[in-house]
Amino acid sequence: MFTQTMPDKRWNVFEVKLDGSGFKQLIHNEEPDLEFYDGTYLPDGRIIANSNIGYQGVPCVSGDDPVGNMVLYTPDTKNLRRLTFDQDANWNPVVMNNGRVMYTRWEYTDLTHYYSRIVMNMNPDGTEQKALYGSGSMFPNSTFDIQPLPGHGSAFVGIISGHHGIARSGRLIVFDPAKARKGAAGMVQEIPYRNRPIVEEIKAVSYTHLRAHETRHDL
């Protein structure tokens, strides 16, 4: 399963076999402005994906960047239901070993700062949305591309990075929320290192944020 644009330039979720055959579009919806990406199968064959279904934009860039919220799609009936109603983006839903779905959420109203991307989890129907790792913590700033460790009850792997900079590029970390759910306390190992302590990195940095129609300084 992967994401690419359709002939009309909208994003959608597709599937292809390893030998290149069986290419097909997975989500079919008649709404002309809806787009879909970051899809994943549920065990029962339904699909969870991100979508611009809220028709909203990121506040700190004047709404220029679309916000994605998660939807649940049933291929047999083409029924589409919205699962999250967040102000800012969700990313990378994936089924955990316990059957719940974990994902990254841009938590704009978190306890510590407005640019935290924390790891969340929920039931496949969108109920019981809860923080799994990083809520109320200054470190890590963002955690992307999370995947559960096969055969483990709670551990997962993800890339930690900052708010600005190279998108989704950073340090590959193994987490175990059963040990702790904030800071470096629940980080088991940084890959590819072994027996190397993980030290929290928290810095205060000023930068100039310029757009074609703006001149301002953010701290």
Task: Locate the predicted segments by residue.
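Short, solvent-exposed loop/turn segments at conserved positions within beta-propeller repeat blades
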Residues: 6-11, 60-66, 111-115, 165-169
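Beta-rich catalytic cores
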Residues: 9, 35-37, 66, 89, ...
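Beta-propeller blade signature
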Residues: 14-19, 66-75, 116-125, 171-180
